[in-house]
């Protein structure tokens, strides 16, 4: 029975209740907002039905059949509004009684909601606390391992340097021996080249005037210089970016090596 009364109340809310929605003089309760929404919904249905009836009357079929749906709809709406006004006092009393009867229910629901919120907050706090404890425990376990790893790395590096030191010394010694042997082997060739060059210079002096060769040599050098100057300039321009790149790479390598040594 209460469900039937509730349905009737929703359908036959008074117009004054709908207007109260727009006035907003006093803060509305949830029940007032519900009643105003129901009234607006009913008014919207009436307007939509009126527009639909007008469109059907204006159509070719409506004119041919002389439906007059709009007039009938207006009559029905007027009758409906009269009935709603007559039931206005009944619906008002129903909403007031329903609001009073459910005050305790809303209070209990708010209380239960607050208890749930407190329980959930307590659980979240406890969960956060446990997570922090686990993170701290993990950090305590990892920190000695990190120190041990760093210590082992330094020890391994030191051992590697000690092992490589004799090898480097041996390589340097062998390189010196190779250089000395190469110098000794090339000594005889350089001596022979110097002697041959001295003989050719002596023969050159005897076969032609020195001044003539000097003039020819100067001329050839001048011609070579003029021809080689553009090529040398192009070579210099081409080498400049390469040298700058090598310089930047070298400085970057030195910087990285310095950072690694500082970190150790």
UniProtKB/Swiss-Prot annotation:
Residues 1-18 form the signal peptide. The keyword Mitochondrion does not apply. The modification Methionine sulfoxide is found at residues 109, 193, 240. It is found in: Secreted. Residues 67-264 are annotated as: 10 X approximate tandem repeats. One of its GO terms (cellular component) is very-low-density lipoprotein particle. Belongs to the apolipoprotein A1/A4/E family. GO terms for molecular function: amyloid-beta binding; apolipoprotein A-I receptor binding; chemorepellent activity; cholesterol binding; cholesterol transfer activity; enzyme binding; heat shock protein binding; high-density lipoprotein particle binding. Glycosylated. Palmitoylated. Sequence repeats lie at residues 67-88, 89-110, 111-121, 122-142, 144-165, 166-187, 188-208, 209-229, 230-240, 241-264. Coiled coil: none annotated. Homodimer. Interacts with APOA1BP and CLU. Component of a sperm activating protein complex (SPAP), consisting of APOA1, an immunoglobulin heavy chain, an immunoglobulin light chain and albumin. Interacts with NDRG1. Interacts with SCGB3A2. Interacts with NAXE and YJEFN3. GO terms for biological process: adrenal gland development; amyloid-beta formation; blood vessel endothelial cell migration; cellular response to lipoprotein particle stimulus; cholesterol biosynthetic process; cholesterol efflux; cholesterol homeostasis; cholesterol import. Pfam families: Apolipoprotein (PF01442). This is Apolipoprotein A-I. InterPro entries: ApoA_E, Apolipoprotein_A1/A4/E. Participates in the reverse transport of cholesterol from tissues to the liver for excretion by promoting cholesterol efflux from tissues and by acting as a cofactor for the lecithin cholesterol acyltransferase (LCAT). As part of the SPAP complex, activates spermatozoa motility. The gene is Apoa1. The lineage of its organism: Eukaryota, Metazoa, Chordata, Craniata, Vertebrata. Major protein of plasma HDL, also found in chylomicrons. Its main location: secreted. Keywords: Cholesterol metabolism, Glycoprotein, HDL, Lipid metabolism, Lipid transport, Lipoprotein, Oxidation, Palmitate, Phosphoprotein, Repeat, Secreted, Signal, Steroid metabolism, Sterol metabolism, Transport. PANTHER family: APOLIPOPROTEIN, APOLIPOPROTEIN A-I.
């Amino acid at each position: 029975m209460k469900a039937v009364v509730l349905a009737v109340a929703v359908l036959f809310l008074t117009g004054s209740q709908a207007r109260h929605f727009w006035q907003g003089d006093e803060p509305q309760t949830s029940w007032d907002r519900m009643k105003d929404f129901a009234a607006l919904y009913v008014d919207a249905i009436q307007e939509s039905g009126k527009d639909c009836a007008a469109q059907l009357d204006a159509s070719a079929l409506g004119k041919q059949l002389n439906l007059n749906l709009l007039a009938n709809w207006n009559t029905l709406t007027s009758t409906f509004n009269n009935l709603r006004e007559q039931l206005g006092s009944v619906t008002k009393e129903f909403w007031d009684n329903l609001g009073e009867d459910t005050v305790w229910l809303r209070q209990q629901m708010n209380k239960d909601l607050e208890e749930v919120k407190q329980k959930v907050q307590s659980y979240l706090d406890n969960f956060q606390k446990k997570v922090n404890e686990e993170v701290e425990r993990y950090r305590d376990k990892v920190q000695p391992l990190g120190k041990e790893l760093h210590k082992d790395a330094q020890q391994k590096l030191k051992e590697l340097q000690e092992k490589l030191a004799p090898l480097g010394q041996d390589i340097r010694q062998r390189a010196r021996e190779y250089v000395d042997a190469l110098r000794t082997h090339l000594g005889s060739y350089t001596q022979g080249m110097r002697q041959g060059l001295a003989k050719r210079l002596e023969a050159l002096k005897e076969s032609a005037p020195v001044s003539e060769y000097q003039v020819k040599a100067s001329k050839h050098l001048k011609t070579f210089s003029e021809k080689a100057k553009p090529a040398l300039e192009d070579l210099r321009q081409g080498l400049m970016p390469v040298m700058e790149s090598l310089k930047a790479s070298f400085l970057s390598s030195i910087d990285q090596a310095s950072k690694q040594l500082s970190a150790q």
